[in-house]
């Protein structure tokens, strides 16, 4: 029998100390990693609920375990809300992550050795879109497309020519570091012209799509995957949307193909997040996310740090640091100043991936805590001050104190 009163702090003080310090870090640091956000207390309550105890292999109404009548309700709510949010024909909410969602889609209609065509990781794509170090790049032949050197944007005419030449069985659209609107309608036309499937990974922009602030890929794609955190602001997890004709294949690939029991506590948290995303204020939040990213990009450009492609249409942008400082050095210096970013390769980067010539900046988390235009100006100048003097301890300490004071004005959880 376990204790009903013993706390983690009492039982495992070393772990509790790490948890406590991480909570403090989240409160005291400005979070600008584009893939991170703060889940609401309701999402975290669902994820920390008794649903974590329940095994439920199968799908609602078709389980391999008894006692699933209540978790069936939770999963059905998540599915129904996902369909309402995105207007899709079928939703699978069991994928443990976006990576597993992508893997399930690949294996549902492709065979090892088939060719896929995805955006190059070096140009803003994602590991799971065919990178050599990922299973997607090991199981399948890969033809990678990228952006134009002159403006950092996808060249759709070149993509069409490449697709005609390479004849992939599936085209993968979506990115992890691309700041412009993606023309899913055009990519859908390209895929159909060669008889290829279209998978859109909208993990980064799902919140924008849900609120109509980015064109939806759903009408144009055979499959759409996403994570449920990032701009959706839910728990860490995955979601697959697809046409009804692929529903059975996708479901079978998730279970029993790739996974066993679903994480019912996470699925419940997804249901909460989807309900939050259906509220009118969620669109206002997403509008502010975009406005903050555009404001921050302009402030930094005014200080001599231009964004790849010249700006942003969404929640993120890449700074090309050129010869001033490496991405690794910038990440470390900004971290010391209580500003969290990640080093990131820029298109046609001459530096290795562990060093890079750029950093990726995103505004979902900062916007969640209440930052607006005024805070973006203050933040942008702080970032530029550090980048201008990345080895100056006095500058870093001054910016750190300012960022900590700013964070205290806008607490995340209180």
UniProtKB/Swiss-Prot annotation:
Gene Ontology cellular component list: cytosol
Enzyme Commission code(s) on record: 2.1.2.1
GO biological process, alphabetically ordered: glycine biosynthetic process from serine; tetrahydrofolate interconversion
Using the UniProt record, name the top-level EC class of this enzyme in a single word. Answer: transferase
| CDD domains with a match to the protein in the record | SHMT
The protein's site described by Plays an important role in substrate specificity is found at 229
Q: Which residues carry this modification: N6-(pyridoxal phosphate)lysine?
A: 230
- Keyword Amino-acid biosynthesis among UniProt keywords: yes
Compartments where found = Cytoplasm
Where is (6S)-5,6,7,8-tetrahydrofolate bound in this sequence? 121, 125-127
Q: Which residues form the signal peptide?
A: none
Q: Quick one: where is this thing mainly located?
A: cytoplasm
**Which cofactor is recorded for it?**
pyridoxal 5'-phosphate
Question: What subunit structure does UniProt give?
Answer: Homodimer.
Assigned protein family: Belongs to the SHMT family.
Q: What does this protein do?
A: Catalyzes the reversible interconversion of serine and glycine with tetrahydrofolate (THF) serving as the one-carbon carrier. This reaction serves as the major source of one-carbon groups required for the biosynthesis of purines, thymidylate, methionine, and other important biomolecules. Also exhibits THF-independent aldolase activity toward beta-hydroxyamino acids, producing glycine and aldehydes, via a retro-aldol mechanism.
- Provide the protein name: Serine hydroxymethyltransferase
Q: Which gene encodes it?
A: glyA
């Amino acid at each position: 029998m376990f204790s009903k009163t013993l706390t983690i702090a009492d039982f495992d003080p070393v772990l509790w100390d790490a948890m406590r310090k991480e909570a403090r870090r989240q409160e005291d640091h400005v979070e600008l990693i584009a893939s991170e956000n703060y889940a609401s207390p309701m999402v975290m309550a669902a994820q920390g609920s008794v649903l974590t105890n329940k095994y439920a292999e199968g799908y609602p109404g078709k389980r391999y375990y008894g006692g699933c009548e209540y978790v069936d309700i939770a999963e059905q709510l998540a599915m129904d809300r996902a369909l309402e949010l995105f207007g899709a024909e079928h939703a699978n909410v069991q994928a443990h992550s976006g990576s597993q969602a992508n893997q399930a889609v690949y294996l549902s209609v492709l065979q090892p050795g088939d060719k896929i065509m995805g955006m190059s990781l070096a140009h803003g794509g994602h590991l799971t879109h065919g990178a050599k170090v990922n299973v997607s790049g090991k199981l399948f032949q890969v033809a990678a497309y990228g952006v134009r050197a002159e403006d950092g944007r996808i060249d759709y005419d070149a993509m069409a020519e490449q697709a005609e030449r390479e004849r992939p069985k599936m085209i993968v659209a979506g990115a992890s570091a691309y700041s412009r609107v993606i023309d899913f309608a055009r990519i859908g036309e390209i895929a159909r012209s060669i008889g290829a499937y279209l998978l859109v990974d909208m993990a980064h922009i799902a919140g924008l799509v849900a609120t109509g602030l980015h064109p939806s890929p759903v009408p144009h794609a055979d499959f759409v995957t996403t994570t449920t955190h990032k701009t959706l602001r839910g728990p860490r997890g995955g979601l697959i949307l697809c046409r009804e004709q692929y529903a059975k294949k996708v479901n079978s690939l998730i279970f029993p193909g790739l996974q066993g029991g679903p994480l019912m506590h996470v699925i419940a948290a997804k249901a909460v997040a989807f309900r939050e995303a259906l509220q009118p204020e969620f669109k206002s939040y997403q509008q502010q996310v975009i406005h903050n990213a555009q404001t921050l990009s302009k402030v930094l450009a005014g200080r001599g740090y231009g964004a790849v492609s010249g700006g942003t249409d969404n929640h993120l942008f890449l700074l090309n640091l050129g010869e001033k400082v490496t991405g690794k050095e910038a990440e470390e210096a900004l971290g010391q100043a209580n500003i969290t970013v990640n080093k990131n390769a820029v298109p046609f980067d001459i530096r290795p991936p562990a060093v890079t010539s750029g950093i990726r900046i995103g505004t979902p988390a900062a916007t969640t805590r209440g930052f607006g235009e005024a805070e973006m100006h203050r933040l942008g100048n702080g970032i530029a001050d550090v980048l201008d003097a990345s080895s100056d301890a006095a500058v870093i300490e001054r910016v750190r104190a300012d960022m900590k004071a700013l964070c205290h004005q806008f607490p995340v959880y209180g």
